[in-house]
């Protein structure tokens, strides 16, 4: 019960400090306790062979699925391995976590890798944290698209992942379109310029992307936000704020996102912001 700390905190705060203020203070302290217990609590993994923290399970599941997707194309190439290594660098994994990630990637390449079981266990470990689960699917989509294309086997694996965490076909296709547009949009000059102006995360290597660098694409910007070209300013702003709320790094961290994954969350927020800014600039909106 992830709210037990809040309940206990309310009664203790009410007794110690008196009144509603004391109860609210107790709820806040209890919330912090619930969060820490959730982060430190171990989860059972029949696949990785030991009890893990949720953060470790997130990281190992990510690389195991990446290995499975790489194998789906027939054989794992040196490019696939290099892309996995680049992701480890982007996540700034220490030596111990790099070793775990490599082991998970190798496990995912096995012919009998139980994809649905792995994702189901991950879903259960995340509980009701839908934003965290959606972000996990996005990470897999981004990684799979790093070579500039998605074949039918890769798409089927991605849909299996999305379906297992409870997404519909429509939700999956919408998210995939948004992710692919973000990849295209990110390869354009506007995103690089925006990121450099913000002192952002362009120090990392993105050699795996093979999209054309033809500058900003307004249609991709619309797709990044999941909106139509003719939507009014208020509708665009609502979509932008909703996505920024879902991808806020601090909020994802509070729901169990590993520290190592924060860089990807920040990059996603940058993409959303850059797309919104380009739309506003094109439309002449303030």
From Swiss-Prot:
Every J domain range: 220-286
Locations listed in the record: Cell inner membrane
Side of membrane Periplasmic, spans: 1-6
Cellular component annotations (GO), alphabetically ordered: plasma membrane
Pfam hit, one: DnaJ
CDD domains: DnaJ (cd06257), terB_like_DjlA (cd07316)
TM region(s), chain numbering: 7-31
Gene Ontology MF term list: protein-folding chaperone binding
Ranges in coiled-coil conformation: none
Keywords: Cell inner membrane, Cell membrane, Chaperone, Membrane, Transmembrane, Transmembrane helix
Domain of life: Bacteria
Residues in the Cytoplasmic compartment per record: 32-286
Mode of membrane association: Single-pass type III membrane protein
Subunit structure: Homodimer.
Cross-referenced HAMAP family: DjlA
Domain free text: The transmembrane domain is a dimerization domain.
Function statement: Regulatory DnaK co-chaperone. Direct interaction between DnaK and DjlA is needed for the induction of the wcaABCDE operon, involved in the synthesis of a colanic acid polysaccharide capsule, possibly through activation of the RcsB/RcsC phosphotransfer signaling pathway. The colanic acid capsule may help the bacterium survive conditions outside the host.
Protein name according to UniProt: Co-chaperone protein DjlA
